[in-house]
Structures are given as structure tokens and as C-alpha cells.
Regions:
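ATP-dependent adenylation/pyrophosphate-handling site
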Residues: 75, 193-199, 203-240
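Enzyme catalytic cores with a strong preference for nitrogen-chemistry domains
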Residues: 1-198, 214-220, 250
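A glycine-rich phosphate-binding loop feature that marks nucleotide/adenosyl-phosphate handling sites
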Residues: 192-205, 258-259, 307-309, 356-358
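Short acidic (Asp/Glu) and glycine-rich catalytic loops that position anionic groups and cofactors
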Residues: 76-77, 157-161, 217-222, 242-244, ...
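Short, hinge-like loop/turn segments at secondary-structure boundaries
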Residues: 4-6, 92-94, 123-126, 239-242, ...
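A conserved beta-strand->alpha-helix junction
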Residues: 138-150, 220-225, 233-278, 284, ...
Length: 358
């Protein structure tokens, strides 16, 4: 079962098993869990509290059954992953459920990254009239304190209200924060000492470097520029400028010898053939080999820089620019990359990404 335990003063008082198991999107709970069938209520300091877990709240039957059995307030425990506009959907749902059943709801959500999922927090408390009376900030661990009491005249549960709500995040701001949290927790949970970013002088690697610094701190980010004979002077200048503005370790490692060595090795087998993308891909694979060698030697995670648009059409080199352990921009379209880069630049008096890169 997907369950919650009720514990008071060190004593286990009971369990609630989730009733509605989602099987859509990133969820596949019916494969792993059995379905719960019973409503669970418990009394605490004169309040009768009903429990729900995540999807239970998105279906009407569980909360209706709790209300009919005498619940005066609902606590809903959630591991609801981030997606754009999801917080507005949650708020609309909570207001609808609270007003329809005339019952306050405490909505607690997980925060942090887990592999390729990000949980954005934003826990809330809604009164029986559907008003949000307490709200936690997004993407941060936070504790809300709410006082619930019986009103002698109406018999309803009255909730205390916070004085100031957290600032709402724009869509681009919440997306950026999700990328930062996702990378931070993946690296920390995996035990890596830091991350390696292969810079090209382009916008994808520039944005990835910013996210890495914001997630881990400049002292744990290592930028490597690996030029070849076709690399422009502008690309070299822009990569160096960004690394210096973000105060990260910056190394230039030319790949000419590695590429020519591989071409020389392949020359007998490539005789009587015409040069094509095969030779071009050797450059990307030489860069991937260098980054992975640095990763093995120093214990840093290689983060790749391909965006969702490139992944969708296969615009990448297998064992080349795809070589790495985590792709920060894998769910970000190229158009969003530009928007995110401009957003990050607006956070600083001096843009950290050179304007001509954008």
C-alpha cells in the first residue's frame, strides 16, 4: 500500500492506505501498490481529522465519504511533481473541494528533486469557504503554523490566517527554479563532488552553466572549453567571459590531437570513402571522451547541454554531446532556452550570459 502512519507521542495510532492509484503521466502506482478501501479519521484536541493521499483529493468520492463520516478538517499528504501551471490547478481544486463539502483542507506537498522529477512544495491551507489562509513558498522547505479552533456560534472549524503570502512566481521563474532544484538534488543524492560542463560559446551550455552555479555554488562547477580548428574566436571569448563572470574554474583543452589521432587510426578502414558527418562526429566524441575522463579521475558528474527540441528530432551525437549523467535542459524547448537565459540575465546588474550569445 501507499500509506500514511498516524503517530502521537511516539505511539502508532493507525494507518491510512491510499484509495485512488493514478496510472497516467509519470505515475504507475497500480503496478506497485494495492488499493486501500477504508476511510480513516482520528481525533486530536477535539478535532476530527480525515486523511487523504495525493490522488485521493483529485477524485470526489474519498473526501465526500470522510465528510459524511464526520470529518471536520482534511489533511492531504502529497508528492505532486512540478509542471508548468500546476500550482494554479492545485489551488482551483482545493477551493472547489473545500467549498463543495464545506470543510477546511491542509494540503502538504513534497519539495525537492528525485531523479527526473521535481517536487515544488507550495503547501497550502484552505478554509471551508475556499480561501487560502496559509501558503508556503515554492521550491523551498518551509513550515506553516496554523491554529484551528471550533467556532461556538457556527460550529465550524476556524483557521488562523498568515499576514503575508509568498510572492507568486512567473512561469519562467518557476521553470528556472525547478531546473535548479532538480540538478541540485540529483548531484547531492548521487554523491558527486561537483559537475563538469563542456562550454561551446553557445546559449545551451551558457544557460546550463548558470543553472549549475545557482544549484551547487561556483566552487563545485568546472567549465571546460574544448576548441578545434573550426572553433571561432568569438566562441572562445564568450565562453571565457561567462566562466569568469560566474567565477567558476575554467579550462581550455584543445581536441586537435585527439581528433587527428582517431582519424589516423581510422584512415586504413576509411580509404576510398568520402568525408561526411562521420568525421564531424569524431569531434563531438573526442569532447565526450575528455569530459568522461575528467569525471572518472576527479569524481565530478558530467552534465550535458542538449535541449528538448534537439532531443525530439535526434539532433545530437551519440557518445558525443550526449555523453554525461544528467541533461539539465532535456525538458526545455529551444524557445524556452532563450527565455530562461534572458530571465537569468535580468537577475544580475551585469548579465552573466554575454548578450551576443543570446
Amino acid at each position: 500500500f501507499n500509506s500514511v502512519a498516524i503517530i502521537h507521542n511516539g505511539q502508532q495510532k493507525g494507518f491510512y492506505h491510499k484509495q485512488c492509484l493514478p496510472n497516467y503521466g509519470v505515475f504507475d502506482e497500480r503496478r506497485y501498490f494495492n488499493t486501500g478501501h477504508n476511510q480513516v479519521l482520528f481525533d486530536y484536541q477535539g478535532l476530527t481529522i480525515g486523511l487523504l493521499i495525493c490522488e485521493d483529493l483529485w477524485q470526489d468520492a474519498p473526501i465526500r465519504a470522510l465528510k459524511e463520516k464526520g470529518a471536520e478538517i482534511i489533511i492531504s499528504l502529497n508528492a505532486s511533481p512540478f509542471e508548468q501551471n500546476k500550482q494554479e490547478q492545485r489551488k482551483a481544486l482545493l477551493k472547489s473541494r473545500a467549498t463543495e463539502h464545506n470543510i477546511p483542507i491542509v494540503y502538504a506537498n513534497s519539495v525537492g528533486g528525485q531523479d527526473d522529477l521535481v517536487f515544488d512544495g507550495g503547501s497550502m491551507v484552505v478554509n471551508a469557504q475556499g480561501k487560502i489562509v496559509q501558503e508556503a513558498p515554492r521550491f523551498l522547505q518551509h513550515t506553516l503554523y496554523v491554529v484551528a479552533r471550533h467556532d461556538a456560534q457556527s460550529g465550524q472549524v476556524i483557521l488562523s490566517e498568515q499576514r503575508k503570502s509568498p510572492l507568486a512566481l512567473s512561469q519562467i521563474a518557476e521553470t528556472y527554479q525547478a531546473l535548479v532544484v532538480g540538478l541540485r538534488d540529483y548531484v547531492n543524492h548521487s554523491g558527486f563532488k561537483g559537475v563538469l560542463v563542456g562550454l561551446s560559446g553557445g546559449i545551451d551550455s551558457a544557460l546550463t552553466l548558470c543553472i549549475a552555479v545557482d544549484a551547487l555554488g561556483a566552487d563545485k562547477v568546472y567549465a571546460v572549453m574544448m576548441p578545434y580548428e573550426y572553433t571561432s574566436q568569438i566562441s572562445l571569448q564568450d565562453a571565457q567571459a561567462q566562466a569568469h563572470r560566474l567565477n567558476v574554474s575554467y579550462t581550455v583543452c584543445p581536441i586537435h590531437a585527439a581528433v587527428e589521432g582517431m582519424r589516423h587510426t581510422l584512415e586504413p578502414m576509411f580509404s576510398n570513402t568520402t568525408a561526411d558527418t562521420t568525421e564531424e562526429n569524431i569531434q563531438a566524441r573526442a569532447r565526450g571522451m575528455i569530459l568522461m575522463a575528467l569525471s572518472n579521475k576527479f569524481g565530478h558528474l558530467v552534465i550535458t547541454t542538449g535541449n528538448k527540441s534537439e532531443m525530439a528530432v535526434g539532433y545530437a551525437t551519440l557518445y558525443g554531446d550526449m555523453a554525461g549523467g544528467f541533461d539539465v535542459l532535456k525538458d526545455v524547448y529551444k524557445t524556452q532556452v532563450y527565455a530562461l537565459a534572458n530571465y537569468r540575465n535580468r537577475l544580475e546588474e551585469t548579465p552573466v550570459i554575454p548578450e551576443r550569445v543570446i
